[in-house]
């Protein structure tokens, strides 16, 4: 079902939506009268460059990560205003995006009549609250990860909000558009893997302690559970095959650090490792580690019966492809087998191609993903379509991690992952 075209026919003239107060799901549902009938944008599965004269007027909130995108370079976008609670970050945003208008807070920015969409790069636990604030004032939203914070209730509140207001929501998951993930997606669509029966993804990021304090006070990152930040890994499979993660078994490791003994999330783990089952019966292993004798990485590997693809590994391997072969050989124990073919893979720079408008055909953050995220959101609004990482895709990346952390707290109990299906 497609959204009413008239509602989206003129982005620049969008009016404010009716307001909804409060941020608990129960209060939200009660006060909204269960008004969840907002229609969805038409689906389109692939990026294609097709600029239009109409421009999206966007407001950027968050002068840290929010400074690393290319809104000002996109031919169909205007950076109308910026915002951050800190003056130094407001000035940084204004300088990066060559924007003369700044607001002291998101709450002020979303009231502006000359803004169509808001890019939310604020503290993780506030993403849902800020999405609600933006949408109740008639603004489309792209949000940093994760889409929802730590609870299923938050995830469902986000979904209810997007349904209620019928506006566009997208999560800015970088791994979806890392260059090797784009390659894996193309291999899968071409059928080169054969049966892709097993995958692995890992996000290893030591050194985050440097973000735990600001001006002597704890930030939201202090003591964050690894699986509450799962999307850099989960997207590596879900975005490639379209599978959904349906069951989780997870184990965690921690030590006697004061950070793990006293944090806002009651999280006892530095590292968490999960095994997921997919709706197709396949296995998917995910490691998210904040500490240990390992080299940092954000990568994956996809194992099929005809071909396997290994993204670059920090220990020096990859990217490589292994193909099943026909020539027979004996292994070191004398067993006869078909000899696999091992080959180096020369990773294309997909950001140099016509997948992007010409001004965005340059490298960018997180393995070239930021220009793709910029284009996908703007293009979805301009051409009245559903963004690839819409609210349903976002929850398919986010919710499995919430469940996995609960499994780790229960010493590896197998838990079901709630499913949120996109209407046909």
Task: Specify the residue positions occupied by each region the protein language model found.
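Conserved SAM-binding strand-loop segment of SAM-dependent methyltransferases
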Residues: 101-105
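N-terminal secretory signal peptides
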Residues: 1-23
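Predominantly a Rossmann-like dinucleotide-binding segment in NAD(P)-dependent oxidoreductases
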Residues: 64-67, 168-170, 175-267, 272-273
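Beta-strand-loop-alpha-helix segment that lines the small-molecule cofactor/substrate pocket
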Residues: 117, 123, 128-176, 191
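C-terminal helix-rich "cap/oligomerization" subdomain common to oxidoreductases
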Residues: 3, 29-52, 117-120, 164, ...
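C-terminal glycine/acidic-rich active-site capping loop/insertion
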Residues: 265, 277-278, 301, 306-389, ...
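N-terminal Rossmann-like dinucleotide-binding module
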Residues: 32-97
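Hydrophobic residues in well-ordered beta-strands that form the structural core
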Residues: 60, 143-144, 151, 169-171, ...
């Amino acid at each position: 079902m497609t959204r009413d075209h008239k509602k989206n026919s003129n982005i620049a003239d969008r009016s404010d939506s009716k307001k909804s107060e409060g941020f608990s799901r129960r209060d939200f549902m009660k006060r909204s009268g269960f008004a969840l009938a907002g229609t969805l944008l038409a689906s389109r599965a692939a990026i294609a460059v097709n600029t239009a004269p109409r421009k999206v007027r966007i407001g950027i909130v968050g002068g840290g990560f929010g400074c690393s995108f290319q809104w000002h370079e996109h031919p169909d976008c205007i950076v109308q205003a910026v915002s951050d609670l800190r003056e130094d970050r407001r000035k940084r945003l204004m300088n990066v995006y060559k924007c003369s208008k700044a607001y002291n807070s998101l709450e002020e920015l979303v009231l502006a009549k000359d803004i169509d969409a808001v890019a939310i790069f604020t503290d993780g636990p506030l993403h849902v609250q800020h999405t609600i604030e933006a949408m109740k004032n008639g603004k489309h939203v792209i949000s940093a990860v994760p889409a929802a914070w730590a609870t299923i209730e938050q995830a469902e509140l986000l979904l209810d909000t997007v349904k209620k207001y019928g506006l566009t929501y997208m999560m800015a998951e970088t791994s979806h558009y890392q260059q090797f993930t784009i390659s894996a997606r193309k291999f899968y669509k071409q059928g080169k893997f054969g049966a892709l029966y097993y995958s692995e993804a890992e996000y290893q990021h030591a050194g985050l302690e440097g973000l735990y304090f600001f001006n002597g006070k704890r930030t939201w990152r202090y003591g964050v559970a690894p699986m509450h930040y799962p999307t850099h890994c989960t997207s590596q499979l879900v975005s490639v095959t379209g599978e959904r993660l349906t069951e989780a078994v997870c184990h965690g490791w921690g030590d006697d650090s004061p950070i793990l003994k006293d944090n806002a999330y009651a999280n006892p783990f530095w590292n968490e490792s999960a095994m997921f089952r997919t709706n197709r019966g396949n296995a998917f292993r995910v490691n998210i580690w904040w500490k240990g004798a390992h080299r940092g990485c954000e990568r994956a590997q996809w194992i099929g019966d005809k071909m396997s693809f290994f993204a670059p590994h920090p220990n020096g391997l990859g990217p490589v492809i292994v193909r099943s072969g026909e020539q027979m050989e004996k292994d070191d124990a004398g067993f006869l087998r078909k000899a696999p073919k091992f080959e180096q893979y020369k990773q294309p720079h997909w950001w140099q191609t016509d997948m992007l408008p010409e001004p965005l055909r340059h490298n960018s953050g997180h393995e070239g993903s930021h220009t793709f995220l910029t284009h996908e959101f703007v293009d979805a609004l301009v051409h009245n379509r559903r963004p690839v990482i819409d609210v349903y895709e976002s929850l398919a990346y986010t919710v499995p991690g919430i469940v996995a952390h609960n499994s780790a707290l229960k010493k590896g109990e197998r838990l079901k992952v709630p499913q949120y299906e996109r209407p046909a």
